[in-house]
Amino acid sequence: MTIDIYWRIGMEGDHASLRTPRRYNRGHAGGYGPGNIAPAVRGGELDGYSYLDHAAAVARASESAGFLGGLLPSFPITEDPWAVAAALARETTTYRFMVAFQPGFLHPVQAARMSASLQRATGGRLVYNIISGGGGPAQLWWGDKVSHDDRYARTSEFLDVLRGVWDGEPFDHAGRFFHTEGAALPPALAGQTFPEVYFSGSSPAAVQAAGCHADYYLSWLEPFADLRAKFDGVRAHAERTGRTPKFAVRIDIVARDTEEAAWAEIEQGWAFVDRAAANRAAQGDSVGAARIQGWVPETITGYRDLEVQPNVWCGFSLIRGGPAFGLVGSYEQVAQRLDELVDLGVDAFILAGNPHLEEAYRVGEEVLPLLGRSRLTRPAAAPPSNPAVPAASPKTRIHQEIS
């Protein structure tokens, strides 16, 4: 079977390593600051290096390492992922850009025009990561006071309108959140491939909306049994509408030659964790974040307290923010856990590691080639001594084949 594997591009910048204090000092979107590696002051002057240069380097590295594309996250502190996708498309060849955005802050007709323009310009390399918002201060930053469940209703209506205008035929809509009369894409843009939709959310409202709209239901990593139950719920909702969604998981990875070396990396990063923050619940009304807190011990005495099953660690968010769960282990162990997730029903992965540039090469070269090896029931056939067709270069390997 074929598994789509994406990498994460750090829109806010990057840590030089997981062992550095919790600050962005490489490719920081906020510009130069003391201790920055890039941009930096050299010879008393700024070196001219920007966060976009760093993002382009990560995109090129992960494309050459065999990843299908990259996730462009969206936060109040970052530049707009739509604009960054357009810029980075010129730096890559086949690389897809998964643009994260909240439908509440963009009219669906304008989103359709932007999307079709990107599809036309890039040869169909746009992918949607639809996020409806987790509440709390980040949501208020946008001035958005729509309730949790209503945000998912708004997202569903947004996607209905976006699809309605996509084929170029006049489309009317009078809904609760959006209104349009006779809207349609112009002939030059109509008919482009509609972007694949990655849809996330753990609440009943999110699962229901995902069942109606998701090509891929996207979840953070959780204990595997809990992921299976979540996928079953999405699948049941989708079947009621005659749809069959696929499933994707976003995972941070620390993979090294040995398991001991991987945990040593975690131990060094753990030295910078705010222990008080480690015992505080997350703000906001995100059901997914609340689920994560349910797996975290009330009192944490050491980093190994957060290993919830072999090689599955829920302390990543304490070291550098973002999702809590990730995989820690040797290259073989991490590949085996990914294989187990494929057995569970996962069709796509969004992987990440700090620093994103070097780890793209490491994971692409050391982990991805191992996927499926533990699933073989017989030895793989030896390649011919004089193959008629040369092996495909990483640039052309956009899907990972799992045997």
Regions found by a protein language model. Give the residues of each.
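N-terminal beta1-alpha1-beta2 module of alpha/beta enzyme domains
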Residues: M1-T92, Q192-P195
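Flexible, glycine-rich active-site loops centered on histidine and acidic residues
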Residues: T2-G48, F105-H173, L221-R235, T244-K246, ...
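Hydrophobic faces of well-ordered beta-strands that scaffold small-molecule active sites
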Residues: I3-I9, G69-L72, Y95-F101, L126-I130, ...
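Short, acidic/polar
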Residues: G48-A61, P81, F199-A209, I266-Q268, ...
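Conserved, mostly hydrophobic/aromatic
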Residues: S62, G66, L88, L118, ...
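Acidic-and-aromatic substrate-binding clefts and catalytic sites of carbohydrate-active enzymes
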Residues: L72-P81, G104-V109, P223-A229, A255, ...
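Alpha-helix-loop-beta-strand connector modules within alpha/beta enzyme cores
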Residues: P81-V99, R154, F158, E239-T241, ...
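Short, conserved secondary-structure transition motifs
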Residues: V249-A261, N386-S403
